[in-house]
Amino acid sequence: MWRVLFLLSGLGGLWMDSNFDSLPVQITVPEKIRSIIKEEIESQVSYKIVIEGKPYTANLMQKNFLSHNFRVYSYNGTGIMKPLDQDFQNFCHYQGYIEGYPKSVAMVSTCTGLRGLLQFENVSYGIEPLESSVGFEHVIYQVKHKKADVSLYNEKDIESRDLSFKLQSIEPQKDFAKYIEMHVVVEKQLYNHMGSGTTVVTQKIFQLIGLTNAIFVSLNITVILSSLELWIDENKIATTGDAKELLHTFLRWKRSYLVLRPHDVAFLLVYREKSNYVGATFQGKMCDANYAGGVLLHPRTISLESLAVILAQLLSLSMGIPYDDINQCQCSAAVCIMNPEAIHFSGVKIFSNCSIEDFAHFISKQKSQCLHNQPRLDPFFKQQAVCGNAKLEAGEECDCGTQQNCFLLGAKCCDTATCRFKAGSNCAEGPCCENCLFMSQERVCRPSFDECDLPEYCNGTSASCPENHFIQTGHPCGPNQWVCIDGVCMNGDKQCMDTFGGEAEFGPTECYSYLNSKTDVSGNCGIGDSGYTQCEADNLQCGKLICKYAGEFLLQIPRATIIYANISGHLCVAVEFASDHEDSHKMWIKDGTSCGSNKVCKNQRCVSSSYLGYDCTTDKCNHRGVCNNKKHCHCSASYLPPDCSVQSDTSPGGSIDSGNFPLVAVPARLPERRHMENVYHSKPMRWPLFLFIPFFIIFCVLIAIMVKVHFQRKKWRTEDYSTDEQPESESEPKG
């Protein structure tokens, strides 16, 4: 059963004046007072930090949560994913406590100064380096909700006991340790919100994972960041819609594109200006490859501390740990982590007795097997390429492993000594590499798997296949009754066959009108807190999936209740799954299924299909192609992009994105100026100005010459006149 996290009260932001007090920023200079060094790394360290005029000692132990082969990935201009060459460290992240305060947690990174969070029982302080400081100055600020009247402990609150410093006391027990390997995807809007830079965004994700690890200490769980993916230029899937819809879309993408990326669970982090939801995941599906994932929505008013609480709650739900019943579940902190209100509280948060019991039950089952695998966590100062380790790293063209491994693999393109291509080779592996050479443009590297999907071709200059493209969402498919949604024809008949087998088809209107109007197990428009949701008349075909069954035998579906009804001569069937059944989503009509003329289903309601944003007209591609998800024409065979207006008998069809054409196709004739402006967004015509300038200069020169000639002629006439008069004057008699 999928679970959606709600913000149960009005969202308040840690930095919003309307909901939070104006908090003063203090300047402090942390002082390192002791440390323990193992293998050239500070495994444990203590800092004295002054807060509000009083010194506190933070005892920290190195906490490594990056896998040994951790990479940050992004996409280049052609849509090919590449690892980023970044200089980051995994040995400078620490976790610990404030000396003298047993209910405290410190999570600090020392990579570039001290950056992190100091949590007391019911108040938190953020610390980070002061930019442009000539000393070791840091800013420290209290994360304080306006409604919370909290402060640091007074001296009387400290337990009367020996407060002598023992670094070894913070060493965690390694018995029964569990590990969650997580792949994180940051979509474009959140990337921009976090700073629009790979380094700053990566550091904030490190902080988020560090804070999350501090929460899971009591369960002896380490969240390992196995890889990070940044969608810098564009999102690879649509990130609109509610949390449930986005979760299903992301999981479909995950199953296609993260198959070869090692991880237990994948999370998509999405920015929303405001949202009533903060995330969604499937409960108890942490180790199920098809459902191990979630989406985390980051409203503008949520701080990084609250975001870590949300992530911890989502991961807990994935491990079968539900929300606490506050009347029966207790913990020693001011608020327990699985309390829905926990995101509104500062300070330490731990798991309740109920959560610990639920976690113990989960790890005792076979479905928790992925948590028992301990990944390699070797410290690294910088990602150094190691030739011969069978991993393609920065600066390498290929790496098939040792010479013996390369021989066994039949790798003949890679020089095992230099990890460079051998002479005459331009690739070593990949869907578009054959015999050490790039495949030609006409070779299909990813065939279409659905009538709404599109094939991709090798581009002749890369061993990789172009990113996946599909017909624009909203395009009609099937017998013009259904529409394409994210590359899949949302065919009602196929939904029925997937649920009830090949002898089922989409039910007639009579079946939907009768069963979905009953508002019970046989038909409804969803399940809410108060029970089944009634279908309004317009929404009858968007509730429970009702199919027409023509088989001779009774249906057999494990852990399911089959509902049969004979309506107007049709044998109509529906199904009811338990809430935690992995196929429970099959009970409902899928979003995007047609429910009338220019209408589709969305969240069990029949709405206008305009929300899909389909704007591809038949004229755009000259009736010889379809628009893809980038709104570019994918032409039929024998026609050329970009607008399918030019015929070529040898063309297999395609688009400027499919790989078998250059990014800007050159047609045999120029398209109309109107089309050129639509495609390239040309600026208003300015060329007459550039032609006018030389003519203006020539004109000015001619004017200058004419003026000069005019005055020269005038001078000549004056001189001639003076010459004629002078002899007459000189002939007059003297005297």
Swiss-Prot record:
The chain crosses the membrane at residues 687-707. The signal and the metalloprotease domain are cleaved during the epididymal maturation of the spermatozoa. Glycans are attached at N76, N122, N220, N353, N459, N566. Residues 1-16 form the signal peptide. GO terms for cellular component: plasma membrane. Residues 708-735 are cytoplasmic. Keywords: Cell adhesion, Disulfide bond, EGF-like domain, Glycoprotein, Membrane, Phosphoprotein, Signal, Transmembrane, Transmembrane helix. GO terms for biological process: binding of sperm to zona pellucida; cell adhesion; male gonad development; proteolysis. GO terms for molecular function: metalloendopeptidase activity. Residues 17-174 form a propeptide. Residues 612-645 form the EGF-like domain. The modification Phosphoserine is found at S729. Residues 17-686 are extracellular. It is a single-pass type I membrane protein. InterPro entries: ADAM_Cys-rich, Disintegrin_CS, Disintegrin_dom, Disintegrin_dom_sf, EGF-like_dom, MetalloPept_cat_dom_sf, Peptidase_M12B, Peptidase_M12B_N. It holds the Pfam family ADAM_CR. Sperm surface membrane protein that may be involved in sperm-egg plasma membrane adhesion and fusion during fertilization. Could have a direct role in sperm-zona binding or migration of sperm from the uterus into the oviduct. Interactions with egg membrane could be mediated via binding between its disintegrin-like domain to one or more integrins receptors on the egg. This is a non catalytic metalloprotease-like protein. Heterodimer with ADAM1/fertilin subunit alpha. A tripeptide motif (FDE) within disintegrin-like domain could be involved in the binding to egg integrin receptor and thus could mediate sperm/egg binding. This is Disintegrin and metalloproteinase domain-containing protein 2.
